[in-house]
Structure formats: C-alpha cells, structure tokens
C-alpha cells in the first residue's frame, strides 16, 4: 500500500470509528534490519545500484548493515531505522499519552523527507 493510500485510509477510518476508537499509523522509511524483504541478492543489487563498495564474502547481516548505514546517511538524524523505532512509535500511539490523537500517521524516517527539502 502506498503511503498516500495509507494516510487516506487512516483518516477515513478515524472519522468512521470516532469517538470510541482512535485510528493512527506509522510511516517508516526503509527498515533493513530484520526485514524479509532484503534477501542477500536484493541487498547486493541495491549496494551495486548505489555504487557502494562491499565484500562479496561478507555475511548477510554485514551486507544489510552496509545498506542500512547508506540509507541512514540520507536522513537528518543519520540513524538507521530499526524495528524498535517503529515499535516505540506504535506504543506511543496506542498509549494514554496519545489519547487525543486520531487520524494521523507518525513518520519514523529520521527526517528523510525534510532532508530532501534543502
């Protein structure tokens, strides 16, 4: 699902389910760590696409880390997005501190979008 479609879905569900249910979501940047969407061949293809040096003999985790670090350099925080970062945002949205928040997506992207506004 595209991020635009997700944003629209979250807003529409928030309207339909209010006031008893809050509907929110997260919009993460690329999460490489722990992702099944990044098998070795895809990681190597991405490293080649971006002309990043790598060792073919490196472990799968080592190659994924190289790719994650490259993606991190493209953000304002220079931090790789980790599944734990996404989980923390979800926990916030599900908890009492967000009791008046509904119909929104929280970007978990290290400022990726803003990095390209410059």
Annotate each predicted stretch with a short phrase.
Residues 59-64, 75-86:
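A conserved structural motif in NAD(P)-dependent oxidoreductases
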């Amino acid at each position: 699902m595209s991020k635009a479609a997700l944003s629209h879905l979250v807003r529409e569900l928030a309207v339909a389910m209010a006031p008893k249910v809050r509907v929110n979501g997260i919009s993460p940047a690329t999460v490489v760590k722990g992702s099944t969407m990044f098998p070795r061949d895809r990681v190597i293809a991405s490293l080649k696409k971006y002309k990043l040096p790598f060792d073919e003999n490196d472990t799968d985790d080592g190659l994924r880390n190289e790719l994650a670090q490259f993606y991190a350099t493209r953000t304002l925080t220079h931090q790789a997005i980790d599944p734990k970062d996404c989980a923390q945002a979800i926990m916030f949205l599900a908890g009492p501190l967000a009791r008046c928040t509904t119909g929104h997506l929280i970007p978990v992207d290290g400022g990726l979008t803003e990095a390209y506004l410059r």
